[in-house]
Curated annotation (Swiss-Prot):
Residues 258-402 are annotated as: Disordered. It comes from the Eukaryota. GO terms for cellular component: cytoplasm; nucleus; protein phosphatase 4 complex. Regulatory subunit of the histone H2A phosphatase complex, which dephosphorylates H2AS128ph (gamma-H2A) that has been displaced from sites of DNA lesions in the double-stranded DNA break repair process. Dephosphorylation is necessary for efficient recovery from the DNA damage checkpoint. The gene is PSY4. Its main location: nucleus. It is found in: Nucleus. This is Serine/threonine-protein phosphatase 4 regulatory subunit 2.
Length: 402
């Protein structure tokens, strides 16, 4: 058995046939034309009675009614039995009383703002859906959620009005022509809300201004705008100019703010000229120091070259002396060998001693002559005689002959 058959049997707990037919046409068949033809006062009276009395006391499970309900899902009552009976009786009475008070307040609001004026709230379709089949949206023990949903839908002030698509376009076009705005139907931001009249717009204007004030303070929009304005003013008042001096590699910034500051600017430019002159004088003095330093460096180079030449001459003299000493040593060795050989010959030929002596003297004289012709004799002390002096040399020879 489908939901339509079940609804036909018990009418979802709705006691009034008149109310059931209207709610069924709106919810099941989506027939909104019935809202234009019904008696608003009679319809709202029966709807409010069903909302405040029947639904909380007979449809939803509560501890006050001991879980009795005429309409509901069996699986909800079996599965959530603890949720229904698990609370204390005093707490349950307090909760149920509070929920009934909320529903009565909703009923009073709808009666005062719509029933007495023969109007319907603009959320009437959603209210009909909740009251026609509340268990399509909530479980049998969720009465508190049902009450919260009704509060959001019923505590409004806008009246319901049926708008056709043609009427919406005509209204949008008329408002756009009046305000000289091209209204694009595809752009929601440019479309006017049809059910807002002039009175409601005037009431919303202070609220919108308050929102703008809060947003601007929190997000610092005003500070940013003020900073931008200050920057623009500074740019308009101050004209900055940069002058580059290529010779001195100096960048000078000059600021011209007002005519009253011409004297200050003149003094600043004179200061720049004086700084340039001082820098040129410093460059001239530096060049003099550089020339003197170069002259000193040349003299130092000449002295170094002379010292190197003297060192080279000393080294050559030392080499010559060393060579002479070697030659003298070799000559002395030859003389000793010759003398040893002669003495051996003399010992072997003892019979002819006179001849050997003459021969030895002749040989020694020849050797001395040969040695004097080949080498330069070294200097000796005064007792031995000065070989470099011919007189001294003659004395030496005489002494050797004797």
């Amino acid at each position: 058995m489908d939901s339509a058959s079940i609804d036909a049997i018990h009418m979802n707990g709705i006691k009034s046939k008149y109310l059931y037919d209207i709610l069924k046409g709106i919810v099941r068949e989506k027939n909104y034309d019935v809202l234009e033809t019904i008696n608003v006062s009679e319809f709202l009276a029966e709807l409010l009675d069903h909302m405040v009395n029947t639904i909380p006391n007979e449809l939803f499970q509560t501890k006050v009614n001991n879980g009795r309900h005429t309409v509901g899902r069996k699986e909800d009552s079996e599965e959530n039995e603890e949720a229904v009976y698990g609370t204390d009786i005093d707490d349950a009475n307090d909760v149920h009383t509070r929920q009934l008070d909320d529903l009565k307040r909703i009923s009073t609001h709808l009666t005062t703002n719509f029933k007495d004026k023969s109007q319907l709230p603009f959320t009437i379709v959603r209210i009909c859906e909740l009251c026609f089949d509340p268990f399509h949206y909530f479980k049998t023990y969720e009465l508190d959620k049902f009450v919260n949903a009704l509060q959001k839908c019923c505590l409004v002030r806008g009246a319901w009005r049926r708008y056709e698509l043609k009427d919406v376009r005509e209204l949008s076009n008329s408002q756009s022509d009046k305000e000289h705005i091209d209204c694009d139907q595809n752009d929601v931001a440019l479309s006017k809300i049809p059910w807002l009249d002039e009175k409601m717009v005037s009431e919303l204007t202070p609220f919108i201004k308050e929102i703008d004030t809060i947003m601007s303070v929190n997000l610092s929009f005003e500070d940013d705008e003020m900073d931008d304005d200050d920057d623009d003013n500074l740019k308009n008042q101050n004209n900055d100019r940069i002058i580059t001096h290529q010779d001195d590699n100096i960048i000078v910034e000059e600021y011209y703010e007002n005519e009253d500051q011409d004297d200050e600017n003149t003094g600043f430019s004179n200061q720049v000229i004086n700084d340039n002159n001082d820098s040129q004088e410093d460059d001239d003095e530096d060049s003099d120091y550089i020339e003197e330093d170069e002259g000193d460096e040349d003299e130092d180079d000449d002295d170094d070259e002379e010292e190197e030449e003297e060192e080279d001459g000393d080294e050559d003299e030392d080499e010559d002396k060393h060579f002479d000493i070697k030659v003298e040593e070799e000559a002395v060795k030859e003389d000793a060998n010759t003398t040893r050989n002669e003495l051996m010959n003399v010992s072997n030929n003892s019979d002819d001693s006179s001849l050997q002596n003459d021969t030895g003297i002749a040989i020694s004289s020849q050797n001395d002559t040969r040695d004097l012709s080949k080498r330069r004799l070294p200097l000796s002390d005064e007792n031995d005689g000065n070989y470099a002096n011919p007189a001294s040399f003659s004395k030496r020879n005489k002494a050797s002959e004797s």
